[in-house]
Amino acid sequence: MLLIAMASGVAAYLIYHSIPALAPAGPYLDKAVKVLQPVLMFMMLFLSFCKIAPRQMRPHRWQAWLLLIQTAGFVIPGILLTLGGRGHGSLLAESFMICMICPTATAAAVITGKLGGDMPGIITYTILINIVTAIIVPAIVPLVHPAAGISFTTAFCMIMAKTFPLLIMPCVCAWLVRFLLPDFHRWILHFNDLALYLWSVSLPLAIVVTTRSIVKSDIPVSYMIGMAAVSLICCIIQFWIGRRIGAKYGSSVTAGQALGQKNTVFAIWMAYTFMTPVTSIAGGFYSLWHNIFNSWQLYRQGHPHHHSD
């Protein structure tokens, strides 16, 4: 089902792009996607928070390791770029930085829950990594990619405004429902897979955004292939490292999703806003890789007789 959702997203944009008569609808479709995506994300997180009691939101040791890895993956290449100057590999280095620091996807809680992981753990990490990103990115970006008028405070506020409304408001609403409307809360809990179905609707929209960023790019094919390779390597490494670290604390699935499943819409926005705009393609390719991997994981979860643990 999820692979079909991804394919439909690619096909939808390519059909639109190939039919000139549809061009006037572009601005309206763009506005619709920009409204629908946050609404779907809000609903997915709201449903996830409804399943979690406030006391379950607590830090774990594996989260500290993952925060360190993401921070190092952004800061170290940033320092090397600053000291070594910009060359032919600078776009690939920026692509690596974006793929490493990008926060956990809001939909990660849905996939983690479906895979039998710890939903409170990954939601806690999602909040923590968004805070870290809002601090680290404004501190390093001016060194790597100076831009007039963007100070630490400005960049910090821009990132917080981009990410936190979709994290905090679903949490507040879910917990208000839990304590003030317990009957409604119990009714919501009957819909176990609703968040997954919402993600299946949200996924084609994300793939449309990804496909558009790739199709509209005018960079040489060699750079595009390089960014695709960098994003694939980052995806594989982060899922693998996350699972390895998580396994030591009994949270293999949760840590793997926390480090590997990214908010690629944010990655694309961050590339356009703070880095070289063409590096947004790396975020687009990462969206393909992690969604393919998630589809495979969910398939294995639903067909346990096809593999052995």
Language-model-derived ranges and their functions:
Residues M1-D309:
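Alpha-helical transmembrane segments of multi-pass small-molecule/ion transporters
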